[in-house]
């Protein structure tokens, strides 16, 4: 299948690529279907693109690229909501704020997107509103 996007051209995907958010992203609550697509020649960043709005996409990354000891405690409620059976089912990604100055790029460690990769369910959760976590530097000088 193909998804025509505003800024990234045509993205090919299959049903298994679709992530259904049980609640939309913060500020985009009405958008619930996304695909996670790798960016060619880039192991750090991926594209989290809405299936419902061809203009909405987020650059995302694993939090472990910038903070090896990053931890998220999942509530029992979230584990049930996302039908998580094992830690191996879980993928954690965070949105990235790009900048022309690479030293100013940040990631939002305060609001991770938790994905059950086997059930294709996800949810963005708020774990911190601390400015240091919301705008965590991608590169430390």
UniProtKB/Swiss-Prot annotation:
Keywords: Bacterial flagellum biogenesis, Chaperone, Cytoplasm, Translation regulation. Its main location: cytoplasm. The keyword Cytoplasm applies. One of its GO terms (cellular component) is cytoplasm. InterPro entries: Flagellar_assembly_factor_FliW (IPR003775), Flagellar_assmbl_FliW_dom_sf (IPR024046). One of its GO terms (biological process) is regulation of translation. Pfam families: FliW (PF02623). SUPFAM superfamilies: BH3618-like. It is found in: Cytoplasm. PANTHER family: FLAGELLAR ASSEMBLY FACTOR FLIW (PTHR39190:SF1). Interacts with translational regulator CsrA and flagellin(s). Acts as an anti-CsrA protein, binds CsrA and prevents it from repressing translation of its target genes, one of which is flagellin. Binds to flagellin and participates in the assembly of the flagellum. Belongs to the FliW family. This is Flagellar assembly factor FliW. It comes from Clostridium acetobutylicum (strain ATCC 824 / DSM 792 / JCM 1419 / IAM 19013 / LMG 5710 / NBRC 13948 / NRRL B-527 / VKM B-1787 / 2291 / W).
